[in-house]
């Protein structure tokens, strides 16, 4: 029998995976990738009795391959917070899905493991921009301000490192981050001491954010703003973090960051406003993307559709 752990290469995917495996250890083949590489289940060839755990990637985007695994006799467990579309009725699949706006996969796992090693889930909440929720959870655990800041920085920087057209845009591959996280055991603060990974991410996160806030908006409306950025490694890395920064600094604001791809299409990151955290996923679905009510994206929007996207964005928000 073989085991497979399939998870998004962002903070939510990696840290949720680690928290789960701290409580339920299992040797498994790791399958992960950059944040927008959502079709990860397609890489798994599991057979009868094999166990596949999937975390923080859209069921809607992987349903066909999940069905393939079930048809082959595999046993699947699925943790996620994205819109799943149609679930599969099968005795060999167990779903842990919650699509509420203020939830992360890490928080779903935290509930599943009854709060064991919960600091990892707090970092996922910080990474997914649930700042108030994460801070309140950290305070409830008795953490001081310095520890809370470190948890926030871990969540933000690991999430930041996941964005890129390819792994070449990142400072560390998701596999390298997962290995460093696993080496921490139950102590999340050991991540700050893992070689130079944390310091490198923190320094470059700060540099890229400084570059982003100097950019001029492409479009401004009453309740939203759109930025259009060039095809550079730093723009791909920072787009999600910059999106979260914009909506955090104005809780009535929705935003979209459109970054030019190498094929002249646009990769787009959308955030609904924090005071009305709805609509991002539905907007992106209209253009072949997907996501959650609060945060969503499009991988390849043709330049010819950018104006239509702008109009739909303004109508949605």
Model-derived features: positions:
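Extended interaction regions within the primary functional domain
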Residues: 43-45, 88-90, 96, 136, ...
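Short N-terminal helix-initiation segments at or just after the protein's N-terminus
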Residues: 59, 162-175, 193-207, 237-243
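Low-complexity, intrinsically disordered regions enriched in charged/polar residues
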Residues: 34, 123, 148, 171, ...
């Amino acid at each position: 029998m073989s085991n497979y752990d399939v998870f998004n290469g962002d903070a939510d995917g990696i840290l949720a995976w680690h928290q789960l495996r701290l409580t339920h250890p299992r040797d498994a083949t790791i399958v992960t990738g950059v944040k927008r590489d959502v079709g990860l289940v397609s890489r798994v060839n599991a057979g009868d009795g094999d166990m596949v755990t999937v975390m923080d990637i859209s069921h809607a985007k992987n349903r066909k391959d999940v069905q393939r695994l079930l048809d082959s006799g595999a046993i699947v467990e699925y943790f996620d917070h994205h819109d799943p579309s149609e679930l599969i009725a099968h005795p060999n699949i167990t779903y842990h899905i919650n699509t509420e706006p203020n939830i992360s996969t890490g928080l779903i796992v935290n509930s599943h493991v009854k709060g064991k090693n919960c600091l990892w889930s707090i970092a996922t909440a910080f990474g997914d921009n649930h700042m108030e929720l994460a801070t309140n959870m950290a305070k409830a655990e008795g953490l001081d301000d310095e520890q809370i800041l470190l948890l926030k920085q871990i969540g933000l920087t690991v999430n930041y490192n996941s964005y890129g057209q390819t792994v070449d845009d990142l400072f560390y591959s998701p596999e390298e981050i997962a290995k460093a996280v696993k080496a921490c055991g139950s102590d999340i603060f050991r991540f700050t001491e893992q070689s130079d990974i944390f310091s490198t991410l923190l320094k470059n996160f700060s540099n890229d954010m400084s570059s982003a806030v100097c950019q001029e908006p492409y479009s401004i409306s009453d309740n939203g703003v759109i930025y259009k950025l060039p095809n550079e490694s730093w723009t791909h890395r920072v787009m999600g973090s910059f999106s979260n920064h914009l909506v955090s600094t104005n809780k009535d604001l929705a935003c979209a960051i459109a970054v030019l791809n190498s094929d002249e299409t646009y990769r787009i990151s959308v955030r609904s406003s924090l005071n009305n955290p709805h609509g991002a996923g539905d907007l992106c679905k209209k253009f072949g993307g997907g996501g959650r009510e609060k945060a969503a994206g499009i991988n390849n929007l043709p330049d010819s559709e950018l104006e239509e996207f702008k109009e739909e964005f303004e109508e949605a928000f």
